[in-house]
Amino acid sequence: MGLQSYFKGLYQRTMRQAYGKAIDEICLALQTSPGRVLDCGAGEGAMFETLNQRLSLERDRYTGVEWNPPLVDAARAKGLNVLQGDLNRALEFADESFGCVFALSVLEHLLNPCRFLREVHRVLESQGVLVILTPNISTYFTAALILAGKMPSSGPHPDSDALIKNEEVFKVSDESLQPDTEIDTPSHRHLVVFSYRVLKRYLRMLGFREIEGRGFGLYPFPNFAQPFLERVDPWHCHQMVFVARK
């Protein structure tokens, strides 16, 4: 097995486990609360379909926000309540509107992620639950890249597809993913990437409580060791999942 295949295997396992954990937490929140759910970065509504399969989630409990108009149209064609909006701006919902808000692989794409999290706290009901999945900038792999004079693979990313490709150490993302960092509204460019400790601290500053974090993918260690290492050192894992209650 070559190094690229090895790291791709690590990445695929990391994302599978991280998304699995996040979805489990969303399902738990929805099972214990009758409130509505807000999907931030809803796309075509794929998460509704997942939650509907798991929980038979009613359509009238689901609301999504998505900035890309064609994806909004596709979601609405499925009968979903998905609104076109910019998560960098104020959320157009009243205070305490939702029992659960989630943002999976969204925070790192925002120019104003702190403002977004403040808005999430505002629109959550008392006892409401936030679930976040986002990459961690504070990893051993990132430290090695910086010491080698490179930029973090987790971002922030420069606005040059050619430069990113030139600097890429291992290609681990889906081959079908098209580079788009040079357009005005990129989907895949990372702008602000938190560390585990800083994100947890900011959630606490906002007034969230019962904040629980999990890390996934402690590179470059092999997959068989990951479950143990992730429990020992979640602070330096590639992906992090946070669950917090208002």
Task: Spell out what each predicted region is.
Residues 76, 95, 113-117:
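Conserved strand-to-helix beginnings and helix N-cap segments that scaffold or border functional pockets
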Residues 71-74, 78, 102, 122-123, ...:
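Secondary-structure boundary/capping motif
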Residues 30-31, 117, 124:
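A generic alpha-to-beta junction signature in SAM-dependent methyltransferases
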